[in-house]
Structure formats: C-alpha cells, structure tokens
Amino acid sequence: MDLTPKVKFLGMTFDVTLMIGSVVSALIVLLLVFLLTRKLSVRPGGRQNVMEYVIDFVSGITGMMLEKKESARYLSFALTTFLFILVANLLGVVVMVTATAHGPIPSLGITAADLKLTDSVSWFKSPTSDINVTVAMAGAIFLYSHFAGIAKSPLGYLQHYVKPFWWMLPIHIIDEVSKPATHALRLWANIFAGEVLILILREGTFYFTGIPLFAWMGFSVFVGCIQAYIFTVLAMVYIAQKVGEE
C-alpha cells in the first residue's frame, strides 16, 4: 500500500491526497459546466445539447421522488452531487500519481519507519476511494434530510417514527441510523476495490496483466458511472422521505 502524505493544522490531520483529489474534482466539474453553458441559444448546439441531456437525466431522478414543483428545488443539488461523484469516481481510473520518497519527510508525516515498508507515496487518487470522503458526504445528506423534514412539518416528522404502530419506533430508528452507513459504504467499497485491483494489475508483467488491466479499467468506468447514479438516487430518496407530500 502506498504512503499517504498528511499535514497537521490547528491540531487536526489532513490527508493531502484527498484534498488534491477533491479540489481537482470540484474544479473539473466547475470547468465542464462553465464550458457547456457558454453562449446558450434557442437552437442548442453540441455542447449545449450535452448539458441539457445531463440536466434532463438528473431531473428524471428528482422527478421520480418528488412532485414537479418540489423536485425543481433540488435539481441543482442533485446535479452537483451527480457530477462531482462521477468525476471523482473516474479520476482514479484515468490518473493515479505516485512518487518515490528517498528519505523521511516529517512535514508530510512520512517517517523512516514508514519507508521501511514502502517508499511509494500516493499523490493523487479518487477521493471517493477513501471512506472518510463518502462518510462525510452521506452524513451531510443525512443531516440535511432530517433538518428539511423538521422545517417542513415538525409534527409530521415526529409522527412518522410511530407509524403504523408505536412499537415500531426502535425499528424506524435503526433504519434511519443505517441509511448513512450503507449510503457511504456502498460507494466507497466499489471504488476502493476497483482501484486496488488496478494497482495490483499495474504491478504485474504487462504481457500477462496488460489485457486484464485495460478490461478492468473499462469496467471501472462503468462502475463509476453506476455508483454516481445510485448515490444520487439514494440521496434524493432519503430527502424525499422527509419532505415529500406522501
């Protein structure tokens, strides 16, 4: 396993690889949306068609969960979530940056003891291949869905925990607690496992692992797209359960 550079700030430790990957993912999404939405016209061209297709696709996700007026409020959120996770998932398939450390780097948390295990330092990977990122995103969606439900109808929010029977309260609580855990673990496990296998195949002899490597990279692109879709759908499901009319 490659070493991960870390920095300490205000008593907290930050993973440099994750910060680079997350910032790059966000910048790529920003740049893509900026380029695809320049010079909009009534008769859309190629770039505008691509953006409109993506918006229609995500609008279909929100429309499945909420009424038309309500779903429009969450379109920007769902679009941003889908694009960020999609780009973050695919970055590790396309780009993995590692370097060789020739000596300890205390400022990045790399010690001589670490170098005895390996001298390979990871500088870039998919942010979603780290469980801390997926837990943070799933946790934020979990908290927001509850706050949105309370803000819309405090009494209705509390009543759903005892429906259809009061003795189902513990079951509802377990269900709510398990949602962010499964939401985060599903995304992380799929992306992490894919990157680990890519690293293993990359270290092998090209004559034996070359074809399996390219085949798995192609499959990883498919998995990355599917997982971005699933994460966004589940996010909207959890929010719709709290703010939906039914």
Report the location of each language-model feature:
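Selective transmembrane helix interface/packing segments
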Residues: M1-E246
